[in-house]
């Protein structure tokens, strides 16, 4: 890439390097981990350099310390190819007694973790990178700051320049750094290429087990149809069998989903468990999401025009895009993103909960007055359920929209914010 676009993870990486001897950057292939780490590295070891790959792996077995020589911070790219390096780095960090020594990047969890005997607690810290948010790719004006909403700002203003057609394109293009400056039609090809690579090779890297590409495709299609749903593996198996006429066992679904998780293609969302005024059963299962909406679009074989003609599917994939962006922003604020749903049917699409105890409630709606009103009503009923004697009241309620030219605060205090105006 000619020009490095600043990432939200840049500042997080610097902060983490100040506090620990080694930082492990994880995330999907193509999301920019190596490029981000290269910006601060004083020396670099590319484990998968074709000319040196076998030599590097052999050296990691015989004399791993040799590979760690170099100015700090030393970047070790695709470290998972040589899991023995983990213990060697832990040992080296212990003996140097300094922070900021190593940055490791990896697009998969090591297929064989038997070589790792220590957890790395106290020496390593983790950083998850995802594809770019709209703010990072230059598609959001960034005039509304999420941090300001947590600090209690009352008025907001911000414009969004995204038309419905442009938004459909951005869902299908995804946040892959390489595609941001490409012509639109070429950019759309890249998500399909990414999907093909997952189906035919990347998913096998996760556990060194060859998988049936046709089954992988069908499972990924089912996963795409269930974005934002709390769907167990049994239901995914039934969905594949019913719609694809290809029987698949629950065990196979579990193995394939686990492999997709290990290569960071899926990132499911945990349930939020607040203190409530009255007892109700909270649904504790995770919510299904791809790490980027473009993977879901590719798995369904659809493009921007298809989304415009099928607003229901567009709504689901728009939610995946918003969750991606909120996760990127939450990381910068020391927060996590959760989902809430209970047996009474009360739901909240996203809850950003910060480490300091503050939290915000968010409903995601593609747009239009009717849907925005639905979102506001849901947020207000969710707020009323929370027992504020036992926990803080929410810092804000927000309807996050796709369409709409500007952000504003309603008279009832709810923020309405287009995703094309938001930043961390």
Question: In which residue ranges do the predicted regions lie?
Answer:
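N-terminal pre-Walker A segment at the start of P-loop NTPase domains
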Residues: 1-14
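Conserved lysine of the Walker
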Residues: 33-34
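Short glycine-rich substrate-engagement loop in P-loop NTPases that contacts/grips substrate
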Residues: 45-73
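Conserved catalytic/switch belt of AAA+ P-loop NTPases
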Residues: 86-110, 118
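Interdomain motor-coupling "hinge/lid" segment immediately C-terminal to the ATP-binding subdomain
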Residues: 114-229
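Accessory nucleic acid-recognition modules appended to NTPase machines
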Residues: 184-358
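Domain-level recognition of nuclease-like catalytic cores that cleave nucleotide substrates
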Residues: 402-424
């Amino acid at each position: 890439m000619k020009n490095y676009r600043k990432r939200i993870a840049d500042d997080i990486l610097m902060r983490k390097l100040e506090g620990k001897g080694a930082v492990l950057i994880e995330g999907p292939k193509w999301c920019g981990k190596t490029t981000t780490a290269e910006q601060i590295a004083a020396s670099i070891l590319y484990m998968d350099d074709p000319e040196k790959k076998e030599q590097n792996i052999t050296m990691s077995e015989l004399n791993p310390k040799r590979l760690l020589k170099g100015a700090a911070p030393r970047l070790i790219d695709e470290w998972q190819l040589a899991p023995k390096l983990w213990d060697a780095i832990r040992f080296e960090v212990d003996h140097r007694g300094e922070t900021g020594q190593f940055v490791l990047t990896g697009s998969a969890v090591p297929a064989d973790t038997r070589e790792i005997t220590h957890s790395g607690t106290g020496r390593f810290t983790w950083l998850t990178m995802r594809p770019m948010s709209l703010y990072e790719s230059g598609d959001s004006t960034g005039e509304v700051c999420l941090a300001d909403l947590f600090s209690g700002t009352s008025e907001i203003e911000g414009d969004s320049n995204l038309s419905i057609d442009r938004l459909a394109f951005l869902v299908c293009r995804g946040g892959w750094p390489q595609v941001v400056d490409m012509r639109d039609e070429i950019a759309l090809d890249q998500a399909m290429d990414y999907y093909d690579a997952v189906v035919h090779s990347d998913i096998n890297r996760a556990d060194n087990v060859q998988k049936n590409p046709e089954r992988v495709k069908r499972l990924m299609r089912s996963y795409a149809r269930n974005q934002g749903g709390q769907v167990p593996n049994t239901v995914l198996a039934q969905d594949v069998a019913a719609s694809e006429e290809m029987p698949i066992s629950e065990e196979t679904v579990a193995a394939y989903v686990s492999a997709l998780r290990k290569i960071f293609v899926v990132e499911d969302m945990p349930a939020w468990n607040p203190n409530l005024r009255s007892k109700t059963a909270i649904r504790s299962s995770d919510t299904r999401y791809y790490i980027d909406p473009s993977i879901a679009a590719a798995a369904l074989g659809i493009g921007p025009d298809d989304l415009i003609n099928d607003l229901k599917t567009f709504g689901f994939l728009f939610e995946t895009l918003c969750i991606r962006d909120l996760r990127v922003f939450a990381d910068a604020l020391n927060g996590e993103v959760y989902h809430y749903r209970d047996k009474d049917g009360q739901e909240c699409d996203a809850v950003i909960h910060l480490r300091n105890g503050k939290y915000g409630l968010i409903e995601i709606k593609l747009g239009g007055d009717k849907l925005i009103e639905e979102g506001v009503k849901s947020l207000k009923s969710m707020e009323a359920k929370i027992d504020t004697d036992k926990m803080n009241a929410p810092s804000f309620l927000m309807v996050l929209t796709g369409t709409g030219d500007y952000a504003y605060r309603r008279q009832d205090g709810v923020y309405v914010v287009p995703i094309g105006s938001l930043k961390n």
